[in-house]
């Protein structure tokens, strides 16, 4: 069991998008059963769109972690770290791989109201999913009072996250 770390951003990183990194989580040329996959984002790239992290299950990864490089993490205020701009009307980030962690990202969707900013559905297994040290902000849902910040119904841990400026009609 190895920890395989891949960098995400510009300037010679392994991947230019989080989506490209996630698409390779079941790539047997990169990972083996039992590996721990770690994607490290840098604040030198614009990450945008809807992201679903559900890879690694076919190959049998032990865990999947999406994090931000230590020097590029937010300082507790918007715009100070690596940002995932949703700008999509569904889910900005869906965390659906077993034993998965997302941490230190800023998640925002100011342009297009998102249904939910972070969605951690029950994937049919009881392995944990964890969200920590996230900034989730600026979503003007404008439709209903649905839980639009973090939706984490089963087998999830959420800690040290700040959720703010989410608006209802």
Range-by-range predicted roles:
Residues 1-3, 34, 61, 97:
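Sequence-level motif detector for i,i+2 pairs with an aromatic at +2
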Residues 3-41, 46-48:
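Acidic Gly/Asp/Thr-rich repetitive segments characteristic of extracellular carbohydrate-active
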Residues 22, 37-40, 63-65, 105, ...:
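Short Gly/Ser/Thr-biased coil->beta-strand turn/linker motifs
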Residues 30-35, 59-61, 144-145:
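Short helix-terminating capping/connector loops at secondary-structure junctions
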Residues 46-65, 73-103, 108-126:
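Extracellular beta-strand-rich solenoid/capping regions of secreted or surface-exposed proteins
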Residues 67-68, 97-109, 125-141, 153-169:
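Right-handed parallel beta-helix
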Residues 73, 140-143:
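Flexible, glycine-rich phosphate/dinucleotide-binding loops
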Residues 116, 144-150:
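Glycine-centered small-residue motifs that form tight turns
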């Amino acid at each position: 069991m190895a920890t395989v770390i891949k960098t995400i951003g510009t300037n010679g990183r392994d991947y230019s998008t989080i989506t490209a990194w996630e698409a390779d989580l079941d790539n047997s040329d990169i990972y083996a059963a039992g590996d721990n996959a770690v994607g490290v984002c840098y604040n030198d790239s614009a990450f945008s769109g809807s992201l679903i992290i559900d890879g690694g299950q076919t190959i049998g990864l032990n865990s999947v972690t999406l994090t931000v490089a230590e020097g590029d993490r937010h300082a507790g205020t918007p715009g100070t770290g690596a940002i995932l701009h949703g700008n999509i009307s569904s889910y900005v980030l869906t965390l659906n791989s077993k034993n998965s962690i997302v941490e230190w990202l800023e998640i925002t969707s100011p342009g297009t109201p998102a249904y939910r900013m972070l969605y951690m559905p029950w994937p049919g297994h009881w392995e944990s999913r964890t969200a920590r040290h996230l900034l989730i902000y600026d979503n003007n849902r404008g439709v209903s009072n649905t839980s639009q910040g973090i939706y984490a119904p089963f087998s999830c841990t959420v800690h040290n996250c700040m959720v703010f400026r989410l608006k209802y009609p």
